[in-house]
């Protein structure tokens, strides 16, 4: 039983999984939206923090909800998702530039000075590539 109160239950569960499930490749977080907007924003933003807090090399962490899948990135990534999917990209780093391939609306010139800037996009290829200008944190949301 965790007694510390510096972190929320989601973070405690992720930390427990990383410490106790050796060889783990993927962590799926379910039920993290809680039916409340503030709960959803808080828990999804924590996904980005996990890339800083924990050594996630070779470990995929994603939040699954009725609305889709959300996962953090901290470097250039290419992933398979198929064409026609809704995709949104969020980052708190307004100095970050993300060059994209496989999206209907390229993100190359997006200035991430507000969360809505790269939302409501569509995938147009089997694979999406997001090239970050520097290591940072961002969230990807797929329907």
Positions of the model-derived regions?
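A glycine-rich helix N-cap at a beta->alpha junction
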Residues: 1-2, 54, 59-61, 84-88, ...
